């Protein structure tokens, strides 16, 4: 386990059934989030061994959101490593390969080949002004 992830073996085990452990990765300080900017967070590699990252940003309502950086049309990062995640007007996440536009508030594609599909949402946990990305549901 890296210094950036925490495991809580009792996570969700209130009914006596075994539950998956909480695995969280340090995201960023809440104060680092600025409207119109995206913070990328490296995630543990999954079964495919490909690098993965989360995109942490503020929705139009000012609440933090987090999505897996993976287009819904093809399983590739929306920025292809360029670190350019947003449209010029900063109103949508942009897949640089397909031109898909995703809403900031819910990650739903509004234009492009994956119309109406949503980016994978990753839960955020906030503790004392620090945001952690819950990666428990991702493939190990």
Predicted regions and their residues:
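Short beta-strand His + acidic residue motifs that chelate non-heme Fe in jelly-roll/DSBH
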Residues: 102-103, 111
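N-terminal pre-ligand scaffold of iron-sulfur
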Residues: 1-88, 103-104, 118-140
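Short cysteine/histidine-rich metal-coordination sites, predominantly Zn2+-binding motifs
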Residues: 85-94, 109-117
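Short cysteine clusters
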Residues: 71, 95-98
């Amino acid at each position: 386990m890296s210094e950036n992830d925490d495991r809580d073996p009792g996570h969700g085990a209130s009914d006596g059934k075994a539950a998956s452990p909480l695995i969280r990765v340090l995201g960023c300080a809440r104060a680092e989030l600025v409207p119109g900017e995206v913070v990328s967070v490296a995630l543990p590699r999954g079964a495919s061994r490909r690098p993965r990252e989360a995109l942490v940003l503020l929705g139009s309502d000012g609440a933090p959101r987090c999505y897996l950086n993976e287009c819904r049309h093809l399983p590739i990062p929306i920025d292809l490593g360029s670190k350019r995640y947003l449209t010029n007007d900063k109103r949508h996440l942009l897949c640089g390969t397909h031109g898909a536009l995703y809403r900031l508030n819910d990650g739903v594609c509004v234009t492009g080949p994956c119309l109406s599909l949503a980016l994978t949402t990753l839960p955020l946990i906030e503790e004392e002004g620090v945001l952690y990305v819950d990666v428990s549901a991702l493939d190990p």
